[in-house]
Swiss-Prot record:
The gene is tgt. It catalyses: 7-aminomethyl-7-carbaguanine + guanosine(34) in tRNA = 7-aminomethyl-7-carbaguanosine(34) in tRNA + guanine. Zn(2+) binds at residues 319, 321, 324, 351. Belongs to the queuine tRNA-ribosyltransferase family. This is Queuine tRNA-ribosyltransferase. It comes from Chlamydia trachomatis serovar D (strain ATCC VR-885 / DSM 19411 / UW-3/Cx). Substrate binds at residues 89-93, 161, 232. Residues 262-268, 286-290 are annotated as: RNA binding. Its cofactor is Zn(2+). Binds 1 zinc ion per subunit.
Length: 372
């Protein structure tokens, strides 16, 4: 079955809404945070059964072990032991972000090109690139990307698109936008030949230009996509993100779920959920955890600071996550980080993921009570 989306409550205070997405592998209560499991695994988190939707990267899974190999083993759900919804990207995001950086990295660096030259050529057919693992030459077209995602068997899939950095040349930006929408139409056409249980979101580009964002919305709205994903360059800071998301969401129909690609840190979620965004994906909680940044109700906690060296409080008093409930103290966690124990990142990741799910429950409650 393709997904079904139901709006359960529309806030009286904003465009925020509480909804439910139904897929063949279960329900997703929205707004939802969607952690990124790059290679089919959430770094430092062993149990993902309580995570409603997980984001896996097609590019990395194509490179190893291969989409066909995963299909032969029963698909991605069977391969990673997950009986809950999965979303996969097209592979394009990873290819271009390896060259230009991710959306989050772009905001920090204003889109300075990264050192690795993995892209060989981009044309209307698709993108030629080198494997980041062994340097072998690979090719990704809209049809190849969608077939790979069908082999993986994710519940929600995305069309191939080109991710451009904030500093892209205006002429090339226009060419890229036109090519991206051709790729998306080809992706959708290929998907609709055999949709099965999968659903496809259309990706809206347009950079920081309101008129281009509106054109992107019209393109996606005019085609039978199952949902909308706000992608592409979102600017250089949170203010830009808010402006881009606000304009884009205002030009989308309420009937389809809306996903914000590559943005899922707490300040951005709080700043944009009022526009009616239904899901946010990011590797932020686990990446922050591996660097000793602990998410708490009182704000981020830098566990490596000397002040926690003899702090015998739980990571966060009152927290019910596995780390806190097992008595992992701030002093002990700091010690684990200082001696480079792998357990440090694991405990921190478990806590951070639990915190994100807690925040999303609070957000849904706030919308239901018309406070957000």
């Amino acid at each position: 079955m393709a997904l079904r989306f139901e709006i359960l409550h529309q806030s009286k205070k904003s465009r925020a809404r509480v909804g439910r997405i139904e897929t063949a592998h279960g329900y997703i209560d929205t707004p939802a945070f969607v952690p990124v499991a790059t290679n089919g695994a959430l770094k430092g988190v062993l149990d993902h059964s309580n995570i409603p939707l997980m984001f896996c990267n097609t590019y990395h899974l194509i490179v190893h072990p291969g989409a066909e190999a995963i299909a032969a083993m029963g698909g991605l759900h069977q391969f990673i032991g997950r009986n809950a919804p999965i979303i996969t990207d097209s592979g394009g995001f990873q290819i271009f972000s390896l060259a230009y950086g991710s959306v989050a990295e772009e905001i920090k660096s204003c889109g300075k090109k990264k050192g690795g030259n993995t892209i060989i050529k981009v044309n209307d057919d698709g993108v030629h690139f080198k494997s980041y693992r062994d340097g072998r030459k690979l090719f990704l077209s809209p049809e190849i990307s969608v077939q790979a995602q069908k082999d993986l068997g994710a519940d929600i899939i995305l069309p191939l698109d080109e991710l451009l950095p904030f500093h892209a040349d205006p002429t090339y930006f226009h060419q890229s936008s036109q090519r991206t929408y051709v790729w998306e139409k080809r992706s959708l056409d290929y998907h609709l030949k055999n949709p099965g249980i999968q659903s496809m979101y259309g990706v809206i580009h347009g950079g920081t230009f309101p008129d281009q964002r509106k054109l992107g919305c019209k393109f996606v709205e005019d085609l039978p996509f199952d949902g909308s994903a706000i992608g592409g360059s979102l600017g250089k800071n949170l203010q830009d993100i808010v402006e881009v998301v606000g304009v884009t969401a205002a030009n989308l129909s309420a009937e389809r779920p809306r996903h914000l690609l590559g943005i899922g840190d707490l300040p951005s979620i709080w700043a944009t959920v009022g526009f009616g965004i239904d899901s946010f994906d990011s590797s932020y909680p686990t990446k922050a955890a591996r660097h000793g940044m602990i998410l708490t109700s009182q704000g981020p906690l830098k566990i490596n600071n000397q002040r926690y060296s003899s702090d015998l409080n739980p990571i966060e008093p009152g927290c019910s996550c596995l780390a806190c409930s097992q008595g992992i103290t701030r002093a002990y966690l700091r010690h684990l980080f200082k001696v480079h124990e792998p357990n440090a990142g694991i405990w921190a990741s478990i806590h951070n993921m639990h915190h994100m799910q807690k925040v999303m429950r609070e957000i849904r409650e706030g919308i239901l009570n018309d406070r957000i």
